[in-house]
Regions:
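Vicinal oxygen chelate
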Residues: 1-5, 10-18, 47, 65-136, ...
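Short secondary-structure junctions
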Residues: 32-38, 98-101
């Protein structure tokens, strides 16, 4: 909950990618996101519920390394620790690069990190206090 009156929270993240079609396939097929809007062949907006991921194809000035892009990672909440483990194996089976394998953290959460086709790091996270909450 925001401490600023009227501010409801983060609406979306926008990513610059080399190939919007490849990125779209990854986020749909691997992470199960649906297309909300596709105004043209260089832009697509995806969602898995109350979130929004904007993907924009950039050819000029694309920073090729993840370090140059200044984005640490995206985090997706998962319903259970067991499901995090299952997803890691499903991602391995699909050929997705695992950046950091499954780990149980000291606060009782658990996660692994993978990378999308552009090297953007994604954390798949079970967090006991959040994973079972439903957004209304």
């Amino acid at each position: 909950m925001s401490q600023i009156p009227g501010l409801r929270g983060l609406r979306h993240i926008a990513l610059k990618v080399r190939d919007v079609a490849q990125a779209k396939r990854f986020y749909q097929e691997v992470l199960g996101m649906g297309v909300v809007w596709e105004p043209d062949d260089k832009n697509v907006y995806l969602s898995s519920g109350c979130d929004n991921l904007a993907i924009h194809e950039v050819t000029d000035g694309f920073a090729h390394s993840a370090e140059e892009r200044q984005l640490d990672h995206l985090g997706f909440i998962v319903e259970s620790m067991d499901r995090v483990r299952e997803l890691e194996q499903e991602f391995v089976d699909r050929g997705v690069t695992i950046v950091h394998p499954f780990k149980i953290h000291r606060d009782g959460s658990a996660s692994f990190y993978c990378a999308d086709p552009d090297g953007i790091v994604i954390q798949m996270l079970y967090e006991p206090q959040l994973s079972l909450q439903t957004i209304k």
